[in-house]
Structure formats: C-alpha cells, structure tokens
UniProtKB/Swiss-Prot annotation:
Any one GO cellular component localisation term in the record: plasma membrane
Protein name: UPF0756 membrane protein ABC2716
Domain of life: Bacteria
Source organism per UniProt: Shouchella clausii (strain KSM-K16) (Alkalihalobacillus clausii)
Pfam families per the UniProt record, alphabetical: DUF441
Length: 157
C-alpha cells in the first residue's frame, strides 16, 4: 500500500506532468527515488535542515556567474549607478533579501504555514509559469503581513 506522502507526491507529479514543469518533475522524481530506495530517513532530515540554504547558495552562484565570466565588471557597475532603473533594482534587491530573511524562520518553525506556502508555490509553478523561489519570498511576505496584523490588533485591542 502506498503511503499518504507517496500518494501526495504522485499527485503532485501528475500536476507537474500536465503543466510540463521540468523543475517540479525533477524535484519530485528525486524525492521519490530517495524515498523508494530507503534513504529517506537519513537524507530527508538533512535536506530539510540545509536545503533552503543550499538552494539560496546555488541561486547566488548562478547570479554571480556573469561577474565570474567577466560579462559584468566595474564598468557596468559604474554605468548602472547612472540609471534610475538600476537604483530601483538595487532597492528591490535589498527589500527582497530582507523580506526573505524574515521568511526563513517562519518556514522552519511553522509547519501549517509551510504547507500553505508550498501549495501556493506548486500552483504558481505548475500553472502560472512561476519559479520555485516562492516559498522563501512568500514566507517573508507572510511574516511581514502577520506582524502588521499583530501590530494593528494591538492598536485596536
């Protein structure tokens, strides 16, 4: 008999296949392979503990490749400071990093919020051509929203 977690992953795989989402297909395939080979008890806790940080590191490496290849250098950095859009991008980068930082603890400490965020990410990735960095940013936005609600509730309560 298939476990609930396996059935859930297979359902997500069906959604990923229908949506033709390669990232989700690969992610689910890796998880099922680990689960079916019996390595889950050892590998899943490590992935859960370190996965977000590893993913952020991989994304950071990808973003820094143009610097490593020389496609972006000090000249381009200097030119960017003359552009309003570059300043908007700089501010956006700072804001997103701060929002995401708030989300990391929320993802680690609040399982029911994590489930909702993961579901939202799966929907966005599968059907709206979203990218799976959503849980981290989503958690940060959720954290800020929850803090705002708490603040407003204190003012009125």
């Amino acid at each position: 008999m298939l476990s609930q977690s396996t059935l859930f992953l297979l359902l997500l795989m069906a959604i990923a296949l229908i949506a033709k989402n390669q990232s989700l297909i690969i992610a689910i395939s890796v998880l099922l392979l680990i689960k079916w080979t019996g390595l889950g008890d050892k590998v899943f806790p490590l992935m859960q503990a370190k996965g977000i940080n590893l993913g952020v590191t991989i994304i950071t490496i990808a973003v820094l490749v143009p610097i490593a290849t020389g496609d972006i250098g000090f000249k381009q950095l200097g030119e960017a400071t003359k552009s309003l859009y570059a300043w908007v991008a700089l501010g956006s980068g700072i804001a997103v990093a701060l929002v995401a930082a708030s989300g990391i603890d929320l993802l680690k400490n609040d399982p029911h919020i994590t489930a909702a965020l993961v579901l939202g990410t799966i929907v966005a990735v599968s059907f709206l051509n979203g990218v799976a960095v959503g849980p981290l940013i989503g958690a940060g936005i959720a954290y800020l929203t929850m803090r705002a609600i708490q603040y407003i509730a204190q003012l009125w309560g």
